[in-house]
Amino acid sequence: MSNKKDIAVKNSGGKKIREAREKVKSDTLYNLTNAVERLKSASYVKFDPTLEIVMKLGIDPRHSDQMIRGVVNLPAGTGKTVRVAVICKAERVEEAKSAGADLVGSTSIIDEIKAGKINFDVCIATPDMMAAIGSVARILGPKGLMPNPKLGTVTLDIKNAIKNAKSGQVEYRAEKAGIIHAGLGKLSFSDQDLLQNLNEFIEAVIKAKPAGLKGSYLKAMYLSSTMGASVQIDLTSIA
């Protein structure tokens, strides 16, 4: 049976949620600047939430020419600590370590992956290791961790790849319904930093529009914060 203290805590939490929702109008369209301001004022959680974007695209990813995928280097970073694994031959291990890789090895890392030990957020590989990595493709692929030359994670330039991963590189990929979702920084970032990240990301997705696509490409866009409110963006305000 709940005591008075428990009830007070629950009521307090409910009140914060109601107050937060009142600050964001569900029937209103916002430009990016106003959206960021609203989400900050409506945040009530005790941790530092992530600013998240959802973009609905007028594509059908089932068609190979409409698969939208790429990477964006966010100017202000993501605010997250990224653990990077590098799979390379022995002669390049020290180079990878010096560049800041958290895990470095060849078959040793592949064996750990097979055993279910995946303690990294990004996996970078040199081209000469891709044949061996193929044995764990079914494990890494569904997790979005499979090295890919189009994303810059299969490369001879280990140093630059590690730098990009650590400094705030974000991958985007359209899901089956044409939805792209990504985290673009912490809500504690300055408005300017968040807007820079947003503009960089949105511009990259818009540039990725398939050449032969008919009809509207950008259908809808929403911003939200972790466990917070969601606001819809006025697409006419996007340059």
UniProtKB/Swiss-Prot annotation:
Keywords: Repressor, Ribonucleoprotein, Ribosomal protein, RNA-binding, rRNA-binding, Translation regulation, tRNA-binding. This is Large ribosomal subunit protein uL1. Part of the 50S ribosomal subunit. It comes from Rickettsia canadensis (strain McKiel). Binds directly to 23S rRNA. The L1 stalk is quite mobile in the ribosome, and is involved in E site tRNA release. Protein L1 is also a translational repressor protein, it controls the translation of the L11 operon by binding to its mRNA. SUPFAM superfamilies: Ribosomal protein L1. It comes from the Bacteria. Pfam families: Ribosomal_L1 (PF00687). Belongs to the universal ribosomal protein uL1 family. InterPro entries: Ribosom_uL1_bac-type, Ribosomal_uL1, Ribosomal_uL1-like, Ribosomal_uL1/biogenesis, Ribosomal_uL1_3-a/b-sand, Ribosomal_uL1_CS. Signal peptide: none annotated. One of its GO terms (biological process) is translation. GO terms for cellular component: large ribosomal subunit. GO terms for molecular function: rRNA binding; structural constituent of ribosome; tRNA binding.
